[in-house]
Amino acid sequence: MNSKQQKKYFVGIDISKDSFDATLIDEFQKKLFYQKFEMNKSGFKSFLQKLEKFDKVLLQITVESTGVYFISLYNYLLNTGFSISVINPLLVHNFHKSMSLRKTKTDKKDSFIIALFTLKNPEILSKHSKQTSTMKRLCRERDKISEEIAKVKTEIKSDLNVLFPELEKHIDPFTKSMLLFLEKHSSANSIRKLRTTQIDAIFNKTKGNKVRMKSVELKKLAKDSIGNGDKYLEKVLSSKIRRLKLYQELNKEFDLEISSFIEQNQSADFDILTSIKGIGKITAQKFLIEVDNIRNFNNHKQLTAFMGTDPSLKQSGTSIMYQGRISKRGNKYLRKTLFQMAVSCIRNDSTFNAYYHKKRDEKKKYKQAVIATGNKLLRVIYSMLTKENYYCESYR
């Protein structure tokens, strides 16, 4: 964004579900207006009328990335030509603490603090694209769908263990051809009644992922099966297979959208990040979308605090003690992603493997050692992305 010498007016917006509070200050920290507005079209128009008294070129607006509530207002202001940034609430919180202000919480003061933060910290404000926040939601939805896929696969295996227990030992039940077949004929009892030509006809309907078993072999396996035929359980299994296929289609659709977004917006960072052994496509995408722009953080400690993998502190009087636990105050999705990346890097990279075992030798528990390795990984990632360097195993 433009430097603070070029901006003369700063608006902080504190948003809730049904309303938002806005404070506008000038470059001398003088409060020019404060007002509460309804979170609807009428409220948006009233706010716009207030802002139109000031030159857009000289005005900088900032909102906190609080849940999903800010997105509609953010897009509305962006479409009307205002310069607007989205800021991590943790940065505002830390700024607030550093100002030694009273601990009473009011929305009026919150919007003023955001405006003051905007004035004092122009270099770390970022202009998000319209898609940034919604892309995070899409990425998180893909995670949920992946979890549902794993869950329904487990349920399908459980049902097959009753209806056709021998099947999984001889063939993968999750190929396209086999799923199509089992959707129609969900038990050994049902398969026994089919002719081999009927089995072949179903297998030949799909392209790729062909069943590696001849129809005559499948029929014999069904004939010798100890599985129990149950028309109600067969309907349940058929329903779960249809659900699995739907989840897989959604997952594929979301994957294409996310890959396209990364290619258009963060391809250079993606290539750098995946140069680390153990960081694959999915985790790299999740990390980059959740962080959004790693250059918004002045150092790796800010990034660690944003994730919530920094050590928690306990203060008593003038003494500050490290608790040994992580604070968990930051982005839980990033914490999960970092943990996944750390586990994979421990398995695939000698540097992180050695660091993990060093922590284990220091009597750290498994999870503690992985988190410590994750924080080391985070330091490396921060350095790589901000300096635009690819990884090598001697990287420190």
Map each language-model feature to its residues.
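A detector of single, family-specific signature residues
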Residues: M1-R396
